[in-house]
Regions:
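Catalytic core of DAGKc-family lipid kinases
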Residues: 88-165
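Redox-cofactor binding/interface segments in oxidoreductases and associated redox assembly factors
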Residues: 3, 61, 168
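ATP/nucleoside-binding phosphotransfer catalytic cores, i.e., glycine-rich phosphate-binding loops
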Residues: 130, 138, 154-157, 206-296
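Gly/Ser/Thr-rich active-site loops/lids in small-molecule metabolic enzymes
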Residues: 146, 156-204
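Short glycine/serine/threonine-rich phosphate/pyrophosphate-binding segments
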Residues: 11-14, 66-72, 175-179
Length: 296
């Protein structure tokens, strides 16, 4: 069993929980050399990132949604089930909260979990390919002009965008930046590419969902936007550069502890985003008698 940890948060207590569980089930627990060294984790086998990706039968990602996405990219060449454990804010993609880790591990051991398949975006730029399980974003940089791009679908011109940001999202990523820009929520079990402009000035002004067999090509015609994959800045784009985006089926495997409640959890979390408070302030909205019930 491999561990992928948030690069800054101290998840040592959770690592101890996982280590105790693996030791009682005769499972070897491994992590990257960097994580083992950074947190001085005893009893873990330290592997290179390449060894971790090629030898694990499963991954537990401790952190937030970004940690989970990184774990899925890590094993995308040989997909294995990934369990996301949230130690961040709302955690749309992570399956369980940190406080529920022990219960989740018990259910996995008892065979009371399932695995769902996820597709991803294959992004071509500059002669190389990268993967994105959430989204690809071309974002306006102050002083560099708006994002201007022509979109072609299956080799045919589709339309033009002029906006502050252009987001190409997977269905799983439809609850992230695309949703904040007014895009729809798409069932994560759907195959397809969601294209959403943020603050469009002219051109296409609405989200469109394109099929998995419709490769996309973006040609930048203006601006010098930042180029992000799954929230990670990878560089800047110049006018005349192109980005291709295609769909890859079954690129990742997600562990579900209670799949029947996944839609309910997402709906509640999306509703919380509409409240004018920070996630840490949400508890203040809960009546005191209900809070006492939670504490018991």
């Amino acid at each position: 069993m491999g561990l992928v940890l948030h690069p800054r948060r101290d998840c040592s207590p959770a690592v101890g929980q996982v280590a105790a569980w693996t030791s009682t089930h005769d499972v070897e627990l491994v992590a990257s050399i960097d994580d083992v060294t950074r947190l001085a984790l005893p009893g873990l086998t330290a592997l290179s990132v390449e060894e971790l990706a090629s030898t694990c039968d499963g991954i537990i990602a401790l952190g937030g949604d970004g940690t989970l996405l990184g774990a899925m990219r890590l094993v995308s060449g040989r997909p294995v089930p990934v369990l996301g454990v949230n130690f961040g804010n709302l955690g749309f993609l992570a399956e369980v909260e940190g406080a529920d880790l022990d219960a989740a591990l018990s259910k996995m051991a008892e065979g009371r979990s399932t695995v769902e398949r996820r597709g991803c975006l294959v992004v071509g730029h500059g002669g190389g390919e990268s993967l994105a399980f959430n989204d690809v974003v071309l974002a306006r940089v102050p002083g560099e002009g708006m994002v201007e791009a022509n979109l072609s679908v299956s080799g045919r011109r589709y339309g033009h965008y002029r906006c502050d940001a252009l987001i190409l999202a997977t269905p799983m990523g439809s609850t992230a930046y695309s949703y904040a820009a007014g895009g729809p929520v798409v069932s994560p079990g759907t195959d397809g590419i969601l294209v959403t402009p943020s603050a469009p000035l002219n051109g296409i002004a609405r989200s469109v969902l394109l099929g998995p067999g419709e490769p996309l090509r973006l040609e930048l015609t203006g601006g010098r936007p930042a180029f992000e994959l799954d929230g990670v800045l990878t560089g800047r784009l110049d006018a005349g550069e192109t980005v291709t985006v295609d769909w890859r089926h079954d690129a990742g495997l997600l562990v579900r502890i209670d799949g029947s409640r996944a839609a309910d959890r997402s709906r509640v979390k999306l509703s919380l985003l509409d409240l004018p408070v920070l996630p840490a302030e949400l508890l203040e909205l809960v009546p005191e008698h209900l809070r006492r019930g939670f504490e018991r």
